[in-house]
């Protein structure tokens, strides 16, 4: 079973979301998603300053197996991207919940966060797959 940290929120598309002290949210893909994709070779990051809608594709993770869209779990403005992934995309594999984060977003609608899955609901989703 994949590691599913209890303090995070999750999307059905296997992105995770963590609220930061400054009120922004850090987003990445889950351990389950990176296991399915395999070894990352490139991450196409979103543009800082871009406004995205919840559910819209905003980045791409390319692995040795496939290229997979990464979706914004909430609407808002991209305020930072993980530049480390340009040289070390494998961080998504080795540390998906920390050093392998993909972007940070400033929410335009906090209510969307509450609508995401908690760890228990995400684990149930994984069991159904």
Swiss-Prot record:
GO terms for biological process, alphabetical: glycine decarboxylation via glycine cleavage system
Provenance organism: Klebsiella pneumoniae (strain 342)
Cofactor note: Binds 1 lipoyl cofactor covalently.
Cofactor(s), by name: (R)-lipoate
SUPFAM superfamilies: Single hybrid motif
Residues passing through the membrane, by range: none
Pfam families xrefs: GCV_H
Family statement: Belongs to the GcvH family.
CDD domains recorded: GCS_H
Domain of life of the source: Bacteria
Limits of the Lipoyl-binding domain: 24-106
Coiled-coil stretches: none
Subunit structure: The glycine cleavage system is composed of four proteins: P, T, L and H.
Signal peptide: none
Residues bearing the modification N6-lipoyllysine: 65
Keywords from the named record: Lipoyl
Identification of the protein by name: Glycine cleavage system H protein
Any one cellular-component term (Gene Ontology): glycine cleavage complex
Function, in words: The glycine cleavage system catalyzes the degradation of glycine. The H protein shuttles the methylamine group of glycine from the P protein to the T protein.
């Amino acid at each position: 079973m994949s590691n599913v940290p209890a303090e995070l929120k999750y999307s059905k598309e296997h992105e995770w979301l963590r609220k930061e002290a400054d009120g922004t949210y850090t987003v990445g893909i889950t351990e389950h998603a990176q296991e399915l994709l395999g070894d990352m070779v490139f991450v196409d990051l979103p543009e800082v300053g871009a406004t995205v809608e919840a559910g819209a594709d905003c980045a791409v993770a390319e692995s040795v197996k496939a290229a997979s869209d990464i979706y914004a779990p909430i609407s808002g403005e991209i305020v930072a991207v993980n530049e480390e992934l340009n040289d070390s995309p494998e961080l998504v594999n080795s540390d998906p919940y920390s050093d392998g984060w993909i972007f940070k977003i400033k929410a335009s609608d906090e209510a969307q966060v509450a609508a995401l899955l908690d760890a228990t609901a995400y684990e149930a989703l994984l069991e159904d797959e």
